[in-house]
A protein has these predicted regions:
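Active-site phosphate/pyrophosphate-binding segments
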Residues: 231, 249-373
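Internal, active-site/partner-interface "lid" segment
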Residues: 242-262, 493-510
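Long, contiguous, secondary-structure-rich segments that constitute the structural scaffold
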Residues: 463-545, 551, 629-647, 651-752
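Extended redox/cofactor-interaction regions of prokaryotic respiratory oxidoreductases
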Residues: 114-191, 197-202, 226-229, 315-429, ...
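N-terminal export/assembly segments and adjacent metallocofactor-ligating motifs
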Residues: 1-238, 267, 275, 393, ...
Length: 752
């Protein structure tokens, strides 16, 4: 019997609404939901392949427990017993920081990943937290924290109303957008062009996005912050800086101008390989546009000056009067955000509240660099204990972190490891307990994180499209039970975790004079919550307490879970609106243009004015049909353009004697890999490009299709000690490499 069901796609940040076709409990098709209030029918190849991913035969169907050195199928009870027996003794003997927690990118794509890891981390009490953020967007969190007082307060470009959009290090035609949730990003960019707007792309590669642009500038990798600083300098130098209506809420303008005095267009031109007059033109056009927005992403984050580049993106939006302005860059307001507080001074944002044990990296946003995980496991010091047990949730750092070989060995030395993962992959193969969540069609979905980054305010929720298969456990229950096992409450009802969070949240809300439930009885409020499960009751609570909520009866027209369920295609909450100064949490209550940590890092950027790479440098590459290391086991999403090839410019290929399709050895500070060359002028001379997330050739995994064409692990080329010092983010782009023909190719050539 065939039927359809709605499901929000969890496979990238666009969060498109899908209509799934289901036959006999199995997803057999997916199409875009034309009635979805946000995505309006858009679908990409990943969403279209939802059914293939959902039914991948290599997905684990039940838990695995290591017995006598081998992972064997086990019951859930055996798995929880083993988990509690492995984690608690480490905490009790060595302390909470000896237990590390690693969170992968898929956590932000699930309800469970949003709701339970914070409880797990707090329950253990560990400072040893490592996530995918420090190989991705942590610089943006840090710059936002320093500018606005809240690391999660990230302005997004108002794509649908802007007249001028400048993208740096971003390729949304392949990524579908990142830190900017926008279904049909390609269509929105085409609409910008159609209404007479201007699109500028700054990227060392001529990406699909660059090919759509009015102007593409192939910047030298790693010099993004220099270019942006020179643009800001031009605005000051030519009297073009105009803060507009937000001027009363901004401080530090004169200090910023002085700090950027050395970064003239002439001073940075050679380093960036963009001439001074072009830099001035970029700044002038930005200032002259009726509305404009600058947007930077992973290419400008994963470089030595990632935090400075992220900061300067928002500095340019401020200096042109486009921050918090329709058509500029605005702050979304999600339905599950906390109740808005009156504007005023906040607590500010702090870095370095604790440090890593080995190299003393400062924490950022509660996290330590993922690049430091291996050394935190394998290197003893006189201070503190090494990480002896590891909880990995949807994480594959052996592929996603620099120097995966070292981490691979380090994981084998742990006293205990538990992995929540649907696959036995390059990382989870080391676990003593593997806890597989069900396929996504069997899970509910609400986007807690991505709604705070969406280009339009809206709220959507979908319940599981198909019921849990026999023997499977909901991911929410898996993580709730993991909380209990790790905190000494093994055997308790997992619903107790949700009840505890609800009770604590409501108790705090009724004490808050700005809350809609101030002074009320928290137990009576809890009794009003609806939902079929603990996670749904928590969602209902967050909606009711949020900026659009009913306030538990205070606003009869406000949001509740019941109202959301009555609108299966979502509820549109309107375009983004100016919000300053209300969301600011800086100590001044204003946008602080030149925070002290930023000012202290500027001398390092000045030194970069004289730096020039002597040879080839490496950059990464996005694929539309992939997302990090996730999807290489789905035949429908591999092959074609989604291949692990090394892009080499024809001039470099000729100089080095590299032929198209030839296996090439790539050598970096961290090691070497071999990949087939793809000779193309899509990269600028002196730059080679290799995508990330590949390298599925390690023994002991169960990902059959991925192993057929495993690709090369680009992170093995990288120096794990090379980080952006403010954020701890890994430097993945602009790193020096050398090329040489593979042994087989060299032998073939010598035989000719």
């Amino acid at each position: 019997m065939s039927r359809t069901a709605l499901r929000i796609c969890p496979l990238c940040e666009a969060t498109c609404g899908l209509v799934l076709t289901i036959d006999d409990g199995r997803v057999t098709g997916a199409r875009g939901d034309r009635e979805d209030v946000f995505s309006k029918g858009f679908i990409c190849p990943k969403g279209a392949a939802f059914g293939a991913l959902d039914s991948d035969p290599d997905r684990l169907r039940g838990p695995l427990v290591r017995v006598d050195g081998e992972l064997r199928e086990a019951t859930w009870e055996e798995a929880w017993d083993a988990g509690a027996a492995g984690i608690r003794p480490v905490v009790e003997r060595y302390g909470p920081h000896a237990v590390g927690v690693v969170l992968g990118n898929p956590n932000v794509h699930t309800m469970a990943g949003a709701l339970y890891p914070p409880v797990l981390i707090a329950g253990i009490g560990t400072h040893s937290l490592f996530t995918a953020s420090t190989v991705d967007q942590m610089p943006k969190h840090v710059s936002s924290g320093l500018l606005f007082g809240d690391a999660n307060l990230i302005p997004v470009p108002d794509l649908d109303r802007t007249d001028h959009l400048l993208l740096i290090g971003a390729n949304p035609l392949e990524s579908n957008g990142s830190l900017c949730t926008a279904p049909d990003f390609p269509g929105r960019l085409k609409a910008l062009r159609a209404r007479g707007g201007t699109l500028t792309v700054i990227d060392p590669r001529r990406t699909r996005t660059a090919r759509l642009a009015d102007r593409h500038l192939a910047i030298r990798p790693g010099t993004d912050a220099l270019l942006l600083a020179a643009m800001a300098h031009t605005l000051f130098d030519e009297g073009l800086a105009d803060l507009g209506e937000r001027a009363p809420h901004i401080q530090g303008l004169d200090e910023l101008a002085a700090a950027l005095d050395d970064f003239t267009p002439e001073a940075v031109a050679s380093a960036c390989d963009i001439d001074a007059e072009t830099i001035r033109t970029l700044a002038r056009e930005l200032a002259a546009a009726p509305t404009a927005a600058v947007y930077g992403r992973i290419g400008s984050c994963t470089v030595p000056h990632g935090t400075l580049a992220s900061w300067l993106v928002d500095v340019l939006n401020v200096l042109t009067g486009n921050l918090d302005r329709p058509g500029g860059a605005l702050f979304p307001q999600a339905a599950t955000d906390r109740t808005p507080r009156p504007a005023g001074p906040g607590r500010g944002f702090a870095l370095g509240r604790w440090h890593s044990r080995v190299r003393r990296h400062p924490e950022a946003k509660g996290e330590l660099p993922l690049s430091a995980l291996a050394e935190e496991i394998d290197t003893p010091t006189d201070e503190g204990e090494p990480v002896r047990a590891l909880v990995a949730v949807a994480a594959n750092p052996v592929l996603s972190a620099p120097d995966g070989n070292r981490l691979d060995k380090a994981l084998g030395s742990l006293d205990f490891m538990v992995s929540v993962d649907p696959y036995l992959n390059e990382t989870s193969r080391h676990a003593d307990v593997v806890l597989p969540p069900p396929p996504p069609a069997q899970s509910p979905h609400h986007d807690f994180a991505f709604n705070t980054l969406a280009v339009r305010n809206q709220v959507r929720y979908t319940r599981p499209a198909v019921p849990l298969e026999p023997g499977r456990m909901a991911e929410t229950e898996i993580l709730a039970r993991l909380v209990l096992a790790a905190t000494g409450m093994h055997g308790a009802d997992p619903a107790a975790v949700d009840t505890l969070v609800i009770d604590q949240t409501l108790a705090k809300a009724v004490r808050d004079p700005h809350s809609p439930v101030h002074g009320r009885d928290p137990q009576q409020l809890a009794a009003q919550l609806t939902g079929d499960s603990g996670p749904e009751r928590r969602l209902d609570m967050m909606l009711r307490l949020g900026p659009y909520g009913d306030g538990f009866g205070a606003d009869r027209d406000g949001l509740t879970l019941d109202r959301l369920l009555a609108h299966p295609h979502g509820i549109d909450l309107g375009p983004l609106r100016p919000r300053l100064p209300q969301p600011l949490k800086t100590r001044s209550g204003k946008v602080e243009l030149l925070p002290e940590p930023i000012a202290a890092d500027l001398p390092r950027l000045r030194a970069a004015l004289d730096e020039r790479p002597g040879g080839l440098v490496l950059v990464g590459r996005r694929h539309l049909r992939s997302n990090n290391s996730w999807m290489h086991n789905v035949p429908a999403l591999t092959g074609g353009s989604n291949r692990c090839t090394l892009h080499v410019h024809p001039d470099d290929a000729e100089r080095l004697g590299v032929r198209d399709g030839q296996p090439v050895r790539v050598k970096g500070a961290g090691g070497e890999v071999t990949a087939p060359a793809e000779v193309t002028d899509a990269v600028r001379p002196g730059v080679v490009s290799l995508p990330h997330g590949w390298g599925h050739d390690r023994p002991g995994t169960r990902m059959g299709h991925a192993a057929v064409d495993p690709g090369a692990n680009v992170n093995q080329l990288l120096d794990g000690s090379l980080l952006d010092p403010l954020s701890g983010n890994a430097v993945l782009n602009g790193v020096p490499v050398e090329l040489a023909p593979s042994a087989a190719a060299a032998a073939e050539r010598s035989a000719l």
